[in-house]
Every structure is written in structure tokens, then in C-alpha cells.
Amino acid sequence: MALRLNPIPTQTFSLPQMASLRSPRFRMASTLRSGSKEVENIKKPFTPPREVHVQVTHSMPPQKIEIFQSLEDWAEENILAHLKPVEKCWQPQDFLPDPSSDGFEEQVKELRERAKELPDDYFVVLVGDMITEEALPTYQTMLNTLDGVRDETGASLTSWAIWTRAWTAEENRHGDLLNKYLYLSGRVDMKQIEKTIQYLIGSGMDPRTENSPYLGFIYTSFQERATFISHGNTARLAKEHGDIKLAQICGMIASDEKRHETAYTKIVEKLFESDPDGTVMAFADMMRKKIAMPAHLMYDGRDDNLFDNYSSVAQRIGVYTAKDYADILEFLVGRWKVEQLTGLSGEGRKAQEYICGLPPRIRRLEERAQARVKESSTLKFSWIHDRESTTLNAPREEHGEIFRQYRSEKC
């Protein structure tokens, strides 16, 4: 049975922040324990930079845990195979100046010279990507909320627990590498970045996966492909600006994300084989909610709309766009052969119809939104010493409307 906690009014991804629910000093995530106006008006320490949704827990029927228990051997053979032995993995030091070498200072100087050719807009996006990677403790925590697959002891030898720990260990290199690169580049305000990371980890994330591995693995499938695209595009742009070393860094991270995407999509593919009706309804549920980006609770101590503003720069320079969102959904629909599912219940068929019709609907809404965005504006980002970066004009209103509209449509 699903437990509904903390009845806070839901808001879309793009609504303005609610200052009355935040302390002026602390803005890390918490969930209010009452829906009363009296409680809502009290500023609490460590409250979120934006409200989280109504919290639903343990929505998966307990008997479905048996499905994941029965897939233990399958996961060992088919999912753990997508991990690399530590000794065969690249490490951040492979791509950075060697501090123990006599040429360290010269190598740093060369890195900084290359970094000078990169525009501020690019650094805003690279910093945002790095901060997202650095919030890894949150993502491991999220995976360990999932019923039937969590690491029950911290060192469990189940296939699911081994995957979660090893995946986390591989992902840990990404934030380490980008963090060190940005530190050496001299182009960014590291203290503001470090504060943003601390705020974000303290805030957590609100993926609305309800402790369900169905929802959780659909979410991670989408997110790994999104990060693969994002890092691939930062690699492309670095190359265009002449920084081949940085392009290599971003490309190696993208390669990891692609491998992880393959593992997660394979899990969901197996769920479609084992329980097509339950899986297609979970897919539709996740898409109705909209896939929230992992760093959507991002805050730097100053900008209440930091994530939206960072996302707008990423959209403008072509690192991650609304078109990419539709492309990912279309890819997953094809990858999991959703259109070809048969023998579904009435609710399952409605979910199937909804999902298959969603990509073109998002594209149409995005085209209309783009037609209305005729200008751009500039905003200061603390990450780049309050220099200005160009954003799309009214990004939250225009692009948020896309998701408000498609989420409101019924099956």
C-alpha cells in the first residue's frame, strides 16, 4: 500500500520559489510535516530551495519484490558485466597535470591557456554538470531507497547491491576529474561552487520514485542517457573551441554514462519481459510526473532559480535541450518496444497509448515555445565570479509550459 506523507501542494518544475518556506541562511531540503498554513509560515532550517512534491512511499505491491529476487542470477550475469575492473578503469590523474613531475607548473600553465579560449557560457554549463556529478552521495542514497534491490547491510553481496556500490565508485571519478580541472583552470569561483555542492547534497533530490525499482530504474535509464548526451555535447564544444584535452575528458565521462545507460535500460527491458503491464504503467507514471533532473534542488546561497538559469544556458548553447528530452523518450520507447506490447490490461493499453504519443506532443509544444522565445537576456552567475552569461528569455515560463501541458493531459 502506498503511504502518502507531507501533503504539500504540488508545483510544476518551473514555478517560482516560495520564500516563505525557507530560512534566509539554510536552504537544504526537508519536507514539511503538515499542510497547515500555520506550519507553512514558519521558516525552518535546512528547508529546500524549492518545494518538493507530495511524498509517496512504498507504492510497489510487496509481492512484486519476488520478481527482483528471482532476477538475482540474471543481474549477476547480465548487469554486473557492464562494470569495469578498477585496474582497467581510467582515473582522473590520467588527464590532469602530474603534481609530482618537474613539469607540473608548465602543464598547469598550458591548461590555463587552453581554458582562456572557452567562453563563460561554456563554463557555466561545465560547472553545473560537475556539481551534478558531485552530488553522488544523493544518488546512491536514492538507489538504496528502492524496495527489493537496496543494499541492506552496506556491504551486501546481492547482485543489486554490488551494482549500486560499483556504479557509485565508477561515477565518483567524474566529479573528481571535472572538479580538479575547474580548480586548475582559474576561470571559476571554487568557493561558490563548493557551497553549491554542499547545498545540493544537503537538499537531496525529489525523483518521485516511491521506493519502487520499476520507477527507479526507468528514471536512471533516462538520466544516464541524458548525462551521456550532455557530456558528449560539452566534449564537442570543447573541441570546437580548441581544447582537445578537455574534449577528451568530457568524452571519457560520456563513454562511462553510455555504458551505465546500457545496464539500466537492460534492467527495464527485462522488467517488460517479466511484467509488461506493471512496467508500462510505471513508465507512463514516471513520464506524467516528468523526469526531474538530479540537480533540480541546486542552490548557491544567492539564486533561488539557479537550476532553471543554468538549464537555460545549457539549452541555448546546445548541451541539453527540450529536444533532447523528447529524443531520449523516443529512444526508450523504441528500445523497450513499447508500441509492440500485447496482452495488456485496459490500464496498460492506456499507458501504452499515452507513452507512444508523448514524443511528438513534446516536440510540437517545444516548437511553439521556441517560436515565442525571440530574445535572450543576461544573468550573473556566482560560479564565474558574477560575470554575466546569456540565457534564453523567460526560459522557465516557456519551457516549463511544455511540461505543464503534457503532464496535464489524460490517457
Curated annotation (Swiss-Prot):
CDD domains tied to this protein: Acyl_ACP_Desat (cd01050)
Transit peptide: 1-28
Superkingdom, taxonomy of origin: Eukaryota
Record note on quaternary structure: Homodimer.
Reaction equation(s) it catalyzes: octadecanoyl-[ACP] + 2 reduced [2Fe-2S]-[ferredoxin] + O2 + 2 H(+) = (9Z)-octadecenoyl-[ACP] + 2 oxidized [2Fe-2S]-[ferredoxin] + 2 H2O
GO molecular function: metal ion binding; stearoyl-[ACP] desaturase activity; stearoyl-CoA 9-desaturase activity
Taxonomic placement: Eukaryota, Viridiplantae, Streptophyta, Embryophyta, Tracheophyta
EC number: 1.14.19.2
UniProt-listed InterPro entries: FADS-2_CS (IPR005803), Fatty_acid_desaturase-2 (IPR005067), Ferritin-like_SF (IPR009078), RNR-like (IPR012348)
Record's keyword annotation contains Chloroplast: yes
Pathway where it operates: Lipid metabolism; fatty acid metabolism
Keyword Transit peptide among UniProt keywords: yes
Predominant place of localization: plastid
Name of the featured protein: Stearoyl-[acyl-carrier-protein] 9-desaturase, chloroplastic
An example Gene Ontology biological process: fatty acid biosynthetic process
Function: Converts stearoyl-ACP to oleoyl-ACP by introduction of a cis double bond between carbons 9 and 10 of the acyl chain.
Alphabetically ordered keywords of this record: Chloroplast, Fatty acid biosynthesis, Fatty acid metabolism, Iron, Lipid biosynthesis, Lipid metabolism, Metal-binding, Oxidoreductase, Plastid, Transit peptide
Entry cofactors: Fe(2+)
Amino acids binding Fe cation 2: 171, 224, 257, 260
Major enzyme class: oxidoreductase
